[in-house]
Amino acid sequence: YKPSLTLSGSKSFEDTNKLTNQSGGDASINDVEPLTKSIKLEQNLLDFNRGITHKRNIIGLDLASAKLIKKEQDIFYEAIEAYTQLILARETLDINKSNLDLLSRQVENDQIRLDRGQITITDLSQSESSFAGAQAQFIEAKNDLLISKLTYENIIGEIKDPNSLQKKSTAIVNIPETLNDAISISKRKNPDILIAKFELDQTKKDLESSKADLIPTASLSLERSYSDDVSSTIDEREKDTLTTTLSWPFYSGGKKRSTISKNANLTSRKRLLLDDTIQTNETKVTSAWSSLESSKSFLDSVKVQVKAAKIANEGIVAEYERGSRTTLD
C-alpha cells in the first residue's frame, strides 16, 4: 500500500493548414507548441487483492522451499543407497572370492584323496560341481560390483578404489523412540505433506483473490502540471488536480463468478489431496517402522546363526580331514 510517484512530460507541434471564421472568411492562424510537465502522487486507499497477492507470494516461497527439501532428501536417499550398495557389492565379491579359493583347494585335495582311494568319484564330482557354481557366482559378483561402482559415480562422484569406503552402521539421524513419535514427526516435517499444505493455502488465496475482484477499490491522487505556450491567448499555466477514484466491478458477464466457482472446486480438490497425503504418509511410516524392527530382529538372528555355523563348520572340517565325512555328506 505504498504510494506511487509518476513524472511525465509532453511536447506538441501544431501546423494548421486552414482556418475560417463563421462568415467563411479566412481567420488568422496562430499555431502554438505546448509543453506540459507534471508530477503525480497516487495512493491506493482500498484494494484487498494486493494484500492477498502478497500473502500468496509468501506461501509460494514456502512451497518452493519445501520442494527444495524434498529434492535434497531424494538425493540423500539415492546417495546413501549407492554408497551402501557399493559396499555390499564389494563385500559380496570378497566372500565369493574366498569361497572360490576354498573350493579350488577342496577340488585339488579331493583329487589327491581319490587317487589314494579315500573317497569316490562321486565325491570329487560334487566338489567340482560346487567349484563351477562358485565360479559363476564370482563372475556375477564382479559384474554387480562394476554396476554398483558406475551407479555410485553417477550419483556421488568418481571413486578409484571401492575398498576405500568405510562401513558404518551409525544412523545419520536420531531414530524416534516409538511409532507414534515417528508419525508425529513426519506430519510436521514430511516434505510431501508440507507441499500439499502450501498448495492448499495457495488455492485458498486464489479463491480469496477471485472474490476480491468483486469488491470495490478506491484511490486518491494529487497531480501538479506545468504548461507552456498553452494557446494563442494563454502562455503559461500551473494547475493542481486532486482526484478520488472509486471502482466497483460488480458485473463482468459472469466471468468473475465462473473464476470463483473454479477456484472453490480447486480448493476442495487440494484439501482432499492433503488428506490423502497425510494418510499415505502414515502408512509409509508404519511400514518403514515395521521393516526397521524386523531388520533388527533378523540381524540378531543372523548373528546367532553365524556363530552356530562357525562352531558346526569347525567340527565338519575336522571330520572331513580325518576321513570320517565324505564330500557328499
Describe each region flagged by the PLM.
Residues 1-10, 16, 43-44, 58, ...:
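Bacterial Sec-pathway N-terminal export signals of envelope proteins
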Residues 6-43, 166-176, 208, 221-259:
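Small/polar, glycine/serine/threonine/aspartate-rich low-complexity segments that form flexible
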Residues 71-97, 105-107, 111-112, 148, ...:
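Amphipathic alpha-helical coiled-coil segments
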Residues 58, 121-130, 261, 327-329:
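Short, charged, amphipathic alpha-helical segments
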Residues 74-187, 199, 288-291, 295, ...:
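Periplasmic alpha-helical coiled-coil/stalk elements that build and connect Gram-negative outer-membrane
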Residues 34-38, 81, 126, 181, ...:
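Transmembrane beta-barrel architecture of outer-membrane proteins
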Residues 1-4, 16, 38-56, 66-73, ...:
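A glycine-/polar-enriched beta->alpha junction
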